[in-house]
Regions:
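Core catalytic lobe of class I
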Residues: 1-298, 325, 330-332
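Class I S-adenosyl-L-methionine-dependent methyltransferase module
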Residues: 106-107, 300-332
Length: 332
């Protein structure tokens, strides 16, 4: 396996290299959960590396190349376990007369062809004004609405697409005292707080039931969009201005619902380390692969700081396990 750099600790492993090449070194059925955000079909270009899937020549070529990655994730995933894909539909352009490409639907159909079973779609609400400021999309301008609202669109949601590998899950993901943590912007009602960690009948556990109602909703309007890991130091001068890590609330919910403590959580597109950080913070072993050296270096910095002072990582971010799956010496 060819990697540019790597760091392996008791709780996490990070590899600077091509995820396709790295996954070849992972045994079958060795991962309990994968959660990640792939490039959005060439909407943004993350590097000039020809191995970067964001550099595909067409939308169709992106889906074809992405299918190779999704197929290998299926190979390394344990039966009955989950892969969770963060994505969004993408515009055909920014002329003010554009249409949307059904990326989420194409990702679903591609995974089904490989053998994954489509389980759920969660919609993550986004503030239209914030989206406009970030993208300058003409279809979101009030001026466009005033001049000709037939050319207007909406601030499309992000999606978390959930797929299950065929077969039986040999280790149930149980919550014997219910869900004990809520991650999101809402405040739990005062009358349910006394049930947090309830070890009696779970039919009485009003805290866990309240949390579950938030998580079981198809529309996640309580994700804190600003709760992300630091990323500004990872940007090269030629980087586009879109860089924004996956929200930690989304990652925390996925890790809590679809893995057990001690499980291996994998991401093929590690970026600045968000998924690995979330896994380790919740007592799992995180394994991540990142092709771009500047992102990889930022991920290492975030993960090292998380080990010593996790609260500082998230505070900084708001300004915007050792695994035996790979051999440490296998680096050339």
């Amino acid at each position: 396996m060819a990697v540019i750099d790597q760091r392996v600790t008791d709780g996490w492993a990070a590899y600077n290299g091509d995820c396709v090449e790295v996954m070849r070194g992972l045994p079958e059925r060795s991962v309990h959960l994968s959660v990640y955000s792939p490039p959005f079909a060439g909407l943004y270009h993350y590097s000039s590396d020809p191995r970067d899937v964001s550099n595909c020549r067409s939308y169709e070529e992106f889906i074809e190349h992405y299918a190779i990655i999704a197929k290998d994730i299926e190979r390394i995933t344990k039966p009955g376990r989950i892969t969770a894909v963060h994505c969004a539909d993408v515009p055909s352009g920014n002329t003010g007369r554009d249409h949307m490409l059904d990326l989420s639907g194409d990702i679903i159909r591609m995974h089904e062809r490989i053998g994954w079973k489509y389980v759920a779609r969660y919609s993550v609400w986004k503030d239209p004004f914030v989206v406009y400021i970030r993208t300058l999309a003409k279809s979101l301008r009030h001026r466009t609405c005033v001049e000709d609202s037939s050319r207007c669109s909406n601030a499309g949601a992000d999606y978390l697409l959930v797929f299950r590998k065929a077969g039986d899950n040999e280790e149930p993901i149980a919550h014997p005292i219910g869900l004990t943590e809520y991650v999101g912007s809402k405040t739990p009602p005062a009358d349910v707080l006394k049930y947090r960690g309830w070890d009696g009948k779970q039919t009485e556990n009003k805290y866990s039931q309240w949390v579950w109602r938030q998580y079981a909703s198809a529309f996640w309007d309580d994700v804190r969009l600003e709760r992300v890991l630091p990323f500004r130091d990872s940007k090269d001068p030629e980087d586009e201005k879109h860089v924004h890590p996956l929200q930690l609330d989304v990652i925390d919910r996925a890790v809590t619902l679809w893995s057990n403590p001690g499980d291996v959580v994998f991401t093929p597109f590690m970026g600045v380390g968000s998924e690995v950080y979330g896994a380790v913070r919740l007592g799992r072993k995180g394994v991540g692969v990142e092709l771009k050296p500047s992102y990889y270096r930022q991920a290492i910095a975030n993960l090292e700081l998380a080990e010593s002072a996790p609260h500082l990582v998230e505070l900084k971010g708001k300004d915007v396990g050792q695994t035996t799956m790979l051999n440490e010496s296998d680096d050339d």
